[in-house]
């Protein structure tokens, strides 16, 4: 296992990389800074991997919620803190899947969106309020908070996640790319109570060998890239197990779901997916 970044693996500084055929100069910045800048256009810049993730989560999220509810309903002698079903969106970004959790989870569940980027959280709050799932009579149903997996501070967590009052389950979509594996799973384990579930999706290492997350800053014209890692699926599973997680089949048999782009997917995801035909770009596991 390696913590070498994609920038280091590609062997360049501020030049062009193999996945950047649009002619923009590349600028590497700290991840939080990058996402604070990206927040303004994150939902509208045509990110095909985000679109693929949204499509896959339509199937994965109900399966995840079924696992969490079955485990919670079957547990006896729960403490008062455990009696409230808490679900975390770890690295919630602009609230894309926080919204889906709020819509799909039982009404008594509390949804907690955490992200290291204040800029992304600001957009998330606006999106969730616009959809009527924040700022309602029950202000505790959906809450957001700043939480940096690279420098976790328990006091920064919402009160409902502090101490022993941990979550029944968490999702983390397209976040792992930016965090060393052990740090990610150790941080996730702090948020989830024993027996809870974690659903993770991420950019596949086959895509990471070519390029990484990033966006074009309309002001400077530069391609802004955060710190990213091309995590191999086997290394991800090993790190999860070191942190005390056990991989659970997503549908009774499929432990890891991987997606390779084909022409049919291009029609679904848009023209930006075309250059990734025949490349495995995404995976998910729980």
From Swiss-Prot:
Q: What does this protein do?
A: Involved in osmoadaptation.
Q: Which GO terms describe its biological process?
A: cellular response to osmotic stress; methylation
Tell me which EC number(s) this protein carries.
2.1.1.-
Q: What is the lineage of its organism?
A: Eukaryota, Fungi, Dikarya, Ascomycota, Pezizomycotina
The EC class name is transferase
Q: Which family, according to UniProt?
A: Belongs to the methyltransferase superfamily.
Tagged with keyword Ribonucleoprotein: no
GO MF term list: methyltransferase activity; S-adenosylmethionine-dependent methyltransferase activity
| Record-given protein name | Uncharacterized methyltransferase AN0656
Q: Which PANTHER family match?
A: TRANS-ACONITATE 2-METHYLTRANSFERASE-RELATED
